[in-house]
Amino acid sequence: LESNNVITRKRVVSFLRTLFHESEIQQFERDNAHLEGFDFIDEVLGYFDFTYKISGRDLERIPSYGRLVIVANHPIGTLDGLALLNLIRRVRPDVKVVANEFLSRFKAYEPVLLPIDNMSGNSRRQNLKNIRSHLEQEGAVIIFPAGEVSRMGPTGVRDGKWSKGFLRFAKETRSSILPIHIDGRNSMFFYALSIVAKPLSTLWLIHEMFKQENNTIEFRIGDKVEWEAFVNTDISAKEVAQMFRRHIYRLGKGKTPVFKTRLSIAQPENIQHIRKELQQCELLGETGDNKKIYLFNYQPNTAIMREIGRLRELSFRAVGEGTQSRRDIDAYDRNYMHLVLWDEDELEIAGAYRFCDTNMMLSIQGIDGIYTSSLF
């Protein structure tokens, strides 16, 4: 009898190792032991040939700077989290993700993780402090508020109730929240198993990950929600968290968002394109700290003008103003000349000022051609 029990245990262990793809995972770790962080993530996504789709306009909604809490639904599990990291780092190399227990076991992920250890109160306090610290250093943090993968329900595949923790981080650090909807699914067997035996279905997720091979998911990114939109409210944090959950799913369906959003500022222009265009401009002089002064005559569809417009919007929003457009460019730019201060050390536009020949402008367009006439 004891011999039969030993044989049975061995068979069960062998089955579980096969089910959890133990040998494949261990072999992958050995083959890529020299990689970590985003390099390791690239290899994981490549191993599964797991890809994602996103529109150019959605990609531009990712803020290129500033404190940012990114929240998303979690339809698949590990792979949708890695794909989201891969996406966000294209704009925000400083992005990190709040880790689940499975990812925390892999040292290769450490550079991009902000793990939470529930085993120790002191450790947990330190981990929460690390998340706040990363945001206070103007970083970006991905959080899956559901804390687990989506399940099948009466309205389809949906996250469970969202934890309010992400709101606390955003409020304490005055961070904007970027909502992202992920369109993806696990197998019907997984959802059926979730109904019958939820703990077992969680273990089954490893097998589900391998069934995602050659799959493609789609990201929909909404405009960011400024912290003022959710901090000054009489609604409880628990209710606000569920409102963000609804916001995400409305985003996925292209419906009107729950929260008032703010159009993200355009992404920076390609540095080499700006430099090439500046070389065609008249060089007026240089400053003592290695900055060059160029005269730029307006031309449509130029990297210089787009970058000036982006920097204007960035500067004015910082003091509570701005056009609330992706770039601050108006009709006066077409008829004005532009002084551009180029920082050769930092490879960026350090400043810009537009001006015109007033007498000439008055003779051609009258008083309406003068910008200051629109202010008084």
Where on the chain are the PLM-derived regions?
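Non-catalytic C-terminal accessory region of glycerolipid acyltransferases
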Residues: 1, 94, 125-273
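Membrane-anchoring hydrophobic helices of lipid-metabolizing enzymes
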Residues: 1-74, 81-83, 90-92, 110-111, ...
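Short, flexible loop segments at the rims of nucleotide/cofactor-binding pockets, characterized by
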Residues: 30, 45-50, 117-122, 155-156
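Short acidic (Asp/Glu) patches
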Residues: 55, 65, 69-71, 77-84, ...
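Structural motif
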Residues: 69-71, 113-115, 142-144
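Conserved nucleotide-cofactor-binding alpha/beta core module
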Residues: 89, 95-124, 128-135
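Conserved N-terminal entry element of GNAT/NAT acetyltransferase domains
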Residues: 262-299
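A conserved beta-strand-loop-helix scaffold within acyl/acetyltransferase catalytic domains
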Residues: 290-376
